[in-house]
């Protein structure tokens, strides 16, 4: 088989790529639901998965697909001023447009309409992102305490202070507030004030629209 098969899609509160956390795990409050495609909704396929606390997701950068690719990219963590090899970064602009994320598995729901649904936290995926594979995270082999982080070691982590008026928070679904504020304060790549403000506005606007749709 030459083509990868989409086995599932994740549903999050992030409808566009500009608000997605720069890495998985940076916003542990951000919730998502993984819904399998009809051909893969057999409950037997997830038997035993509930015994694991974390999962690996292999997915597609569906919002950043390009026909060509560049051997070097400008990582946002370096301010966009220094080029690094694409395989030395996690840039979405890769030959195969594949992403890898580690998420916490909160629970496995058995839905009559959708089959097994995985409720996860800490994902860095846009709503509707196609998933190619799901694997359990194995601490004894996947954790490397002596790992070296290359150019990311020693970089300062910046956070935004976000103040949201109570009347605005009330218009956002209660189960989405903590994750949204987590994205705005610590999940975004360091940017200029103007760009950050635009991202904040975009995220708030998108969630307000979704809040209206749920009513």
Positions of PLM-derived features:
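Glycine-rich, low-complexity intrinsically disordered segments
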Residues: 1-102, 106-215
């Amino acid at each position: 088989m030459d083509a990868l098969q989409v086995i599932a899609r994740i549903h999050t509160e992030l409808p566009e790529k500009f608000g997605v956390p720069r890495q998985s795990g940076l916003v542990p409050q951000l919730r998502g639901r993984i819904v399998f495609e009809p051909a893969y909704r057999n409950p037997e396929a997830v038997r035993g998965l509930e015994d694991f606390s974390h999962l690996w997701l292999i997915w597609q950068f569906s919002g950043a697909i390009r026909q060509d690719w560049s051997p070097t990219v400008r990582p946002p963590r370096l301010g966009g001023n220094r080029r690094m090899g694409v395989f030395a970064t996690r840039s979405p602009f890769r030959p195969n447009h594949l992403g890898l994320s580690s998420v916490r598995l909160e629970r496995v729901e058995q839905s009559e309409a959708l089959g097994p649904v995985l409720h996860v936290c800490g994902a860095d995926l846009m709503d509707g992102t196609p998933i190619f594979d799901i694997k359990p995270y194995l601490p004894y082999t996947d954790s490397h305490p002596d790992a070296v982080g290359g150019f990311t070691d020693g970089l300062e982590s910046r956070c935004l202070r976000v103040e949201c008026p109570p009347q605005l928070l009330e218009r956002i679904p209660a189960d989405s507030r903590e994750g949204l504020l987590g994205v705005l304060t610590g999940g975004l790549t360091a940017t200029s004030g103007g760009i950050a403000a635009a991202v904040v506005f975009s995220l708030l606007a998108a969630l307000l629209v979704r809040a209206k749709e749920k009513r």
